[in-house]
Amino acid sequence: MPKGYWVTFYRSVSNPAALTAYGKVAGPAIAAGGGRILARGAPARAYEAGLDQRCVVIEFDSLERAFAAYESPEYQAAKKLLEGSVERDVRMVEGI
């Protein structure tokens, strides 16, 4: 079964303290859902469109596990901590 990947790009962060608080709650919620953070932070180098956006890549044993972790009550509680503080794009993709 192919792995699932949760990829988030942060277009803007207006409240870094909210992002820190989110991380403290989201990390355990994601881990409880089977997620493993593979990469997190600003790009070392940006190509093509050249957007310098914070990025997070999380691996799951399957795409279904990624969906379930995102939709879990624990993660949804963490997500509320970001309201009004970030603009981001969250995508789920299946590995090959």
Predicted regions span which residues?
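Short S/T/G/P-rich N-terminal loop/turn motif that feeds into the first structured element of a domain
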Residues: 1-54, 61-71, 94-96
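C-terminal structural segments of small proteins and small subunits
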Residues: 63-91
